[in-house]
Structure formats: structure tokens, C-alpha cells
Amino acid sequence: MSSGVQGGPAAHANAYQTHPLRDAASALGTLSPQAYVDVVSAAQRNFLERMSQLASEQCDAQPAAHDARLDDRPALRAPQERDAPPLGASDTGSRASGAAKLTELLGVLMSVISASSLDELKQRSDIWNQMSKAAQDNLSRLSDAFQRATDEAKAAADAAEQAAAAAKQAGADAKAADAAVDAAQKRYDDAVKQGLPDDQLQSLKAALEQARQQAGDAHGRADALQADATKKLDAASALATQARACEQQVDDAVNQATQQYGASASLRTPQSPRLSGAAELTAVLGKLQELISSGNVKELESKQKLFTEMQAKREAELQKKSDEYQAQVKKAEEMQKTMGCIGKIVGWVITAVSFAAAAFTGGASLALAAVGLALAVGDEISRATTGVSFMDKLMQPVMDAILKPLMEMISSLITKALVACGVDQQKAELAGAILGAVVTGVALVAAAFVGASAVKAVASKVIDAMAGQLTKLMDSAIGKMLVQLIEKFSEKSGLQALGSRTATAMTRMRRAIGVEAKEDGMLLANRFEKAGTVMNVGNQVSQAAGGIVVGVERAKAMGLLADVKEAMYDIKLLGDLLKQAVDAFAEHNRVLAQLMQQMSDAGEMQTSTGKLILRNARAV
């Protein structure tokens, strides 16, 4: 029988493969500590029961069924004769007593071993359970924090979306209000052009002001809602970043638990559905990115429109200021030309008066008239050739020493009086300068007619200054050239013959009007000389006043030029602001792209970790 058993297919099989505890033993490496304790306890009970059964059979001298052994192998015996008594029959009692003792010893030994093994397993199981519970509590806490952060980020994203929609609607309302303002402005302009009555114009103007007020309120609401949307968008971004940090903490805790408790820990512990919120967080962040991108685009469009409108307005103002500047410059040039013409006319009148006075002085003042004519012609020639008027240089000391201090004193008194009356400082100074020049001229004219001693002193100073300047002029190259020109002009034009003829004609004219006495001629000559002096002073005063007016116009032109430069700077500043807005938009998009790239890398790392765990897992 034994040979038959050995000769069958089971003879070539491994005893471990057919052992009843094979499955339990193979599962020891993958079971939890509690299951491991249960398996070992069952194996010990099975072993003790089997040992008790074998011991009782041997004590009763009864062979076990099928000669069964603990390892299910057949019991082999030496061949015996049929009639021969079994060996060792006399010491059956002793053998039975030895088997019982062996069973008792084995039982005690197994009891001790089992007790120590169970205690150790229980201790390890308790430690394992405590560590597992702590890890589970930590993971649960992190999972709850992650879930809360995800919910808050989602709620903030929804609030930001609603705020963005409200800001968009407010922007549309503001555009509609601007269109209403443009329509009201057009109706008002058309009414002004058509010349409608004042009551209709007032009604249209009131409607225009109301539309402007509504447009201002609409723009204020739009700006407030846009600021609120931006604030909520920033809050949503911060919450999304916080949720991402919580997710990273959860991933780190899971990786640490996997390394500490083995690769099969994730298989033994069911995965909490709260930890699978990466997809939800990705969706929330994607939605948040869409909102941020949309908000950045709208903000860029709004800034671009605002800067474009501001640039258009500044360009219109710049064009207007430029036109005003050109007009002021042209006005100043025309004023300067006009005053120059007036000065020339008065100069020729003075020359004519000098020639008229020659008739009553017997030709004595004709030389002065000729000199005046020569100076006038020479001044025009010098101005045309060199661009410099020597008459202006001659009169400059008079202006600096006499007229300017007098005009400044009178102007200061007038300015102080106007300021004391409540007039603006700048306007008072301008009016004082003009009135000072006029009052100075009037005073000199009045003094010339009255013949006061002060005028004589002034006249003496004027004559001394002019004599000195005239001497310097005649010694200079210009004076020498002027003398040569006058001589040539006299020779070519017959000025000497003209002078003699003029003297003869003047003598006849003097006799015709009844001026026979020398005293009468001198009296008329003095009167003509006074008239010439008065006209000369009036000419200088008018020229000074004209210079002041021209200076005022030039000052206005310079102010307009400053406004033009300021407008050009504003346009450049608006261009720089628009460039900064574009750079900020590009930076926001770059940050969002980097955030999404980090999320993608985190998802890829999580997938790789899952694949590694699955490869290292063993089937139970």
C-alpha cells in the first residue's frame, strides 16, 4: 500500500503543496497583524489537536487510521513474520507512559511558546494599530483641511465669477450712459446752431447735465464693481494656492505612510474619497485661471480704451494750444510791424516839421533837418544791411537812465494801488506797466508844453547822452560809413544845390506870410521845435508801449508753448502707462501658465507613485 502511494502521481509532489496549512502560511507575509494572530492561533490549535490524537492512539496501542502522520506521510515499518509477536510488547506500558509524557511536555512547550508568541504579537499589533490610527488621524485631518480649502476656493471662484459678470454689466451700462451723453450733447449743439429759444436751450442743457451725472454715477459703479471683482479674484487665487499647499501636505503624508508601513498599506486601508480631490482642485484652478485671464483681458482693454481717449483729448488740446500759439506769435509780429510803421511815420513827420521850421529861421534849421533826414536814411540802410538800428543804440542810454526808472516808479505805485483795491497781482503788474508808460509819456509831453525846469534838466541829460553816443557812433566804422554814404548821396542827388534852392524858397515863403522880423521867425521856429520835440517824445512813448504790448503777447505765446510741451509729455506718459499695462498682462499670464504647469507635474508624480505601488503589490 505504501509503495502504491509512493508510486502514484502524489509521490512526485511536494509535501508543502498538499499541506492543509499551505494557504494560511503563504498569506502570512501579506496579512494584517490581527489576521496574522488568527492564522497562528488556528495553526497552533490544529497542531495540538493532531498531537493529542496521535498520542491517544499510541497509548491505546491502536494504529492511526491510514497510518496518518502529522505531515500526512505514510508510516514505514520493518517486515515481520505473521506468527511472531510484535516487538516490544512487553514494554507497552512503558512506551505508552513515555508517549503520554511526551504529549504532556509538548503541550506545555506549545502552551509556553504560544503564550509568548501571542503576547508579542499582541504587543506588536497594539503598536501597529496605534501607529496606524495616528497615521489615519493625520491623514483624515489633512484630508479635511484639503476638502475645506477646496470648497472655499470653489466658493471664492464662483463669487469672483459673479463679481466679474456684475462688473461687465456695469461697464455696459457705463457705455450706454456715455452714448446717452453724446446724444444729448449733439442735440444741444444742434439747438445752439439752429438758434432755438433760451428756454429750449436751458431744457436741453439740463438734460445734458443730467446725462453726464448719470454717466459719472455709472462709471463710479463700474469702477467699484471692477475693484470688487479684482479683490475677489485675488482672494480666490490665495485660497487656490492654500488648497494646493494642503494637497501637497496630503501627498507627503501618504508617501511617508507608504514608506513606513510597507507597500501593501494602501491595499489594506481603503482609500478615503476625500483624498481624491486633485481632479476637483484642478477643475477649480482651471476655472480660476479662466476668470483671471478674462479679468486681465478686460482690464487691459479698459486701460487701453481709457489711455486712447486720454491721448485723443490731449492731442486735441495740443492742436488747439498750437493754433493759439501760432496766433499769438503772429499777433506779436503784426504788433511789432505796426509799431515800427508808426515810429517811421512819426519820424518822417518830425523831419517834415524840421524842414518847415527852416522857413522861419532863414535856413539855419535846414542843416538840422538834413541831419535828421540823413540819420533816418542811414538808420534804414544800417537796419537793412546789418540788421542793427543805431538809433536804437543812441536812445538806449536815455531809456536806461531816465525813462525806465521813471516808468518803473510810476508802474510800482499804480500796481500797489490796484493790489490794494483787490486786483490780482499778475494783472495789476501788467496794467501798471502799461499805465506807467502812458503816464510817463503824458507827463513828458505836458512838461514839454509847460517848459518846466525839470524838463530842461532831463533835456540836458538827453542831449549829453545823445551827444556822447553820437560821437562814439561817428568814430566807429558805422559812423564813417554813414558819413561817406551821406556825402555820396549829397553829391549824386545834388543835395547842396537843393539846400540853396530850398533856402531861397523858404526866404520867399517867409516874406509871403509876413514874417519879416528875425524875432518873429525865431518864435515860430521855437514853436516848431517844441512841436517836433513833443512828437519825438510821443513817438518814443508809443514805441515803448508797443514794446510792452509785444512783450505781453510773446509771454502769452510762451505760456501756450509751455502748455504744448506739457501736453506732449502727458501723451508720452500715457504711452508708457499703456506699455506697463501690457507688461503686467503678460506677467499675469506667465504666472498662470506656471501654476498650471506645477499642477500638471504634481498629477504626473501622483500617477507615477500609483504605478510604483501597483507594481510592488503582491496578490493575496
UniProtKB/Swiss-Prot annotation:
Keywords: Coiled coil, Host membrane, Membrane, Secreted, Transmembrane, Transmembrane helix, Virulence. Residues 66-84 have a biased composition (Basic and acidic residues). Residues 58-95 are annotated as: Disordered. Residues 309-339 form a coiled coil. The chain crosses the membrane at residues 355-375, 401-421, 430-450. One of its GO terms (cellular component) is extracellular region. InterPro entries: BipB-like_C, IpaB/BipB/SctE_N, T3SS_SctE/BipB. It comes from Burkholderia pseudomallei (strain 668). Plays a role in the bacterium-induced formation of multinucleated giant cell (MNGC), which is formed after host cell fusion, as well as in the intercellular spreading of bacteria and in the induction of apoptosis in macrophages. May act in concert with other effector proteins to induce fusion of host cell membranes. It is found in: Secreted; Host membrane. The lineage of its organism: Bacteria, Pseudomonadati, Pseudomonadota, Betaproteobacteria, Burkholderiales. The keyword Metal-binding does not apply. This is Translocator protein BipB. Pfam families: SseC, T3SSipB. Belongs to the SctE/SipB/YopB family.
